[in-house]
A protein has these predicted regions:
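An internal, amphipathic alpha-helical element
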Residues: 9-28, 32
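Extracytosolic ligand-binding ectodomains
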Residues: 1-10, 30-495
Length: 495
């Protein structure tokens, strides 16, 4: 009792979860040490051995759990306790029956998302090195199931891979609905699943759920950190498509700007089917609606003040003398100048739409204001179509195949050789995920799915084509995007 009191005082300074963990460990060790002494020949034996087995199971110490369960069976003739002991042994046997070298894979290989599933599978196959496998070389096995992009198929796939194929872990799925359904089932069956989806909050489904994919919130946070923190842009405009994608990124960007102390000066949406964006752009710079007289007067005063500071930029004072009221009337009839009170413009749309939108800005007398975008901008076609209008644009990316990294270069060359096409982010992500898991299996210390889960958290020595991969305590990959900028006719990594 005195030892337990001392332990309680010691644990009081820690967070509740650590104090509980410490207490459980202490009790387990104490019970294990004195079990024979206190349990021999009395009615408490089954209770003690059952508690020991339960604690060891929770700690994933299966050898000790098995020993305690067998002691439980031997300690009593009562059928109730014997049955509990056998159930524990069956559970241990089931946990140890997984195939540590076998990985399950859930991808949409048919249906509307098949093209994305196939690209991901290409990367996974390349990562398994199936094209250069030497005879007799140890390798992991991949069991693939087609989700068809449907949540129901994803759930069935998890059940089959976990209960029948007995895989150690699962990669996938890709699509949002399939991923959330598969994650919930994987958590229920206590099998690690590394999802490849952008779905926010998916790792909240449980401790067995991981994600290896760049999520929008991290991408925008990185973009704003560069724009506000380093380039010192402060004022922003947002021009976004009236779609779920556009609205999502508009809100994400706006929230991020607010959090970092920036300002949103203009926000306009457009119909995704539009090809003329003059109205929206004019609204952003005060050219669409009649200007109040107070604003007109303020702009005139600003213009006079600027002329006094920079007289060489103003008109010759002798010019127009003698024209009197005619000159003033002509000045009033001139098209007003745009009010560009922002330092950058954020457009969350794909490269095809951006190529249509960008030329409208100089056409409406808006020059030298850089664009910010999303990873959907990443295409050489954007530069081919509208390169002159998107110079200095910045956007995040999860993978840059033109990187000078040897790791990336070798991956791109191997992918082209085997698939006769260039890899994208999905192929790169699939490649890195399977390589990461291969390295875990190669360590040879994994016996159960819980072991595998713990190794995922602890492994921090993998550098792949999408960057360094480690996972935080919530199962989210800790990986920053690269920021790309357009200079001349090429994309470059922003230093």
């Amino acid at each position: 009792i005195e030892e337990l009191k001392a332990m309680a005082e010691y644990a009081a300074g820690y967070a509740a979860e650590y104090a509980l963990e410490y207490a459980a460990q202490y009790v387990a060790e104490y019970v294990a040490e004195y079990a024979e002494e206190y349990s021999a020949g009395n009615n408490y034996s089954p209770h003690i051995y059952h508690q020991m087995a339960s604690v060891f199971l929770e700690e994933n110490t299966l050898d000790k759990a098995k020993e305690a369960a067998m002691s439980l069976i031997r300690s009593t003739p009562q059928e109730y306790w014997v049955s509990i002991g056998r159930q524990i042994l069956e559970r241990i046997e089931k946990e140890l029956s997984v195939k540590e070298g076998v990985i399950g894979c859930l991808l949409p290989l048919s249906g509307p998302f098949a093209i994305y599933g196939q690209e991901t599978l290409n990367g996974i196959q390349l990562g398994m090195d199936i094209f250069n496998q030497s005879a007799g070389e140890k390798r992991i096995e991949l069991i693939i199931r087609d989700t068809r992009g449907e949540a129901e198929e994803a759930v069935l796939g998890v059940e089959e891979l976990a209960n029948e194929a007995r895989v150690i872990a699962i990669i996938g799925p890709l699509t949002s609905k399939s991923a959330i359904a598969a994650a919930r089932k994987a958590q229920e069956l206590e099998i690690p699943i590394i999802t490849l989806t952008q779905r926010e909050g998916i790792t909240d489904e449980g401790e067995m759920v991981f994600r290896n994919f760049l999520i929008p919130s991290k991408a925008i946070a990185s973009l704003l950190s560069k724009a506000i923190g380093e380039i010192e842009l402060r004022r922003f405009a947002i021009l976004y498509p009236d779609t779920p994608y556009g609205r999502f990124f508009m809100n994400l960007f706006w929230d991020g700007v607010d959090e970092m102390g920036g300002e949103i000066r203009a926000v306009e949406s457009y119909n995704p089917d539009d090809t003329d964006f003059a109205v929206e752009i004019k609204k952003m710079v005060g050219l669409h609606y009649p200007r109040p007289e107070s604003v007109v007067q303020m702009l005139k005063e600003q213009k006079i003040a600027e002329a006094e500071v920079n007289p060489e930029d103003s008109e010759d004072p002798e010019e127009g003398q003698g024209e009197g009221e005619e000159a003033e009337e002509k000045d009033d009839e001139e098209e007003p100048e745009p009010i560009v009170d922002f330092d950058a413009i954020f457009i969350p749309d794909n490269y095809e739409q951006v190529a249509l939108i960008a030329p409208h800005f100089p056409f409406n007398s808006i020059f030298n204001v850089p664009f910010l975008g999303t990873s959907a901008w990443q295409s050489p076609e954007l530069i081919k179509i509208a390169g002159d209008y998107v110079q200095r644009a910045i956007f995040p990316s999860g993978f840059f195949k033109e990187s000078k990294s040897d790791t990336v270069r070798e991956f791109v060359e191997a992918y082209k050789k085997n698939f006769d096409s260039e890899p994208g982010i999905l192929a790169a992500n699939g490649y890195d995920t399977i390589c990461f898991l291969k390295n875990l299996v190669a360590k040879g210390t994994i016996r159960t799915r819980k072991d595998f889960r713990e190794e995922i958290f602890q492994y921090d020595d993998y550098y792949g084509v999408t960057g360094t991969i480690t996972f935080d305590h919530q199962g989210e990959v800790e990986k920053d995007p690269v920021l790309l900028t357009i200079t001349g006719k090429h994309l470059h990594i922003l230093p």
